[in-house]
Curated annotation (Swiss-Prot):
EC number: 3.1.2.28
Family statement: Belongs to the 4-hydroxybenzoyl-CoA thioesterase family. DHNA-CoA hydrolase subfamily.
Organism listed in the record: Prochlorococcus marinus (strain MIT 9303)
The protein's name in its UniProt record: 1,4-dihydroxy-2-naphthoyl-CoA hydrolase
InterPro entries in alphabetical order: DHNA_CoA_hydrolase (IPR022829), HotDog_dom_sf (IPR029069)
The protein's annotated pathway: Cofactor biosynthesis; phylloquinone biosynthesis; Quinol/quinone metabolism; 1,4-dihydroxy-2-naphthoate biosynthesis; 1,4-dihydroxy-2-naphthoate from chorismate: step 7/7
Length: 151
């Protein structure tokens, strides 16, 4: 299985993603990041029911929640309706209970934006830190970034 299949994704900017000036509104970038992360997990072979509480076809609520504890973005150039974007995801395990994903958005081979989203694994009932879910562990390992880093 080639990680490029789930770490390099594409999307076209839609009219509804832009503001009155026809430029992507800043908050859309984080929505795209989360959607790209979800798509990456699905392309890898994980179902939404394995990761996200409340998913359709989920017979059991996942024991682990993955709230976002930090996010940041840098915008390098305007993104317009109709632009074709290449989105590269670079997941990084930080420790046994957290990871982050770096996102790079390219348009016409130029970097349009960078973003980072950091997740923490917590027990869905107690809300205390816990180990990452097995599926996320597998996704991180298969993405070639299974090493432990510093937060």
């Amino acid at each position: 299985m080639n990680p490029e299949n789930w770490l390099l994704l594409r999307r076209v900017v839609r009219f509804g993603d832009t503001d009155a000036a026809g430029v992507m509104h800043f908050h859309q970038l984080f929505r795209w990041c989360h959607e790209a992360w979800e798509e990456s997990l699905e392309q890898y072979g994980l179902t939404p029911a394995e990761i996200f509480p409340g998913s359709r076809k989920s017979e059991v609520t996942p024991e682990v929640a993955l709230p976002i504890i930090h996010c940041q973005a840098d915008f390098r150039r305007p993104i317009h309706s109709g632009d074709a974007l290449a989105m590269e995801l670079r997941p990084e395990r930080l420790n046994p209970n957290s990871f982050q994903v770096h996102f790079e958005f390219r348009c016409e081979e130029q970097i349009a934006a960078h973003a980072l989203i950091r997740h923490l694994a917590i027990n869905a009932k107690t809300r205390h830190r816990c180990a990452l879910p097995e599926g996320i562990d597998r996704w991180l390992e298969a993405s070639g970034v299974g090493k432990i880093g510093s937060i």
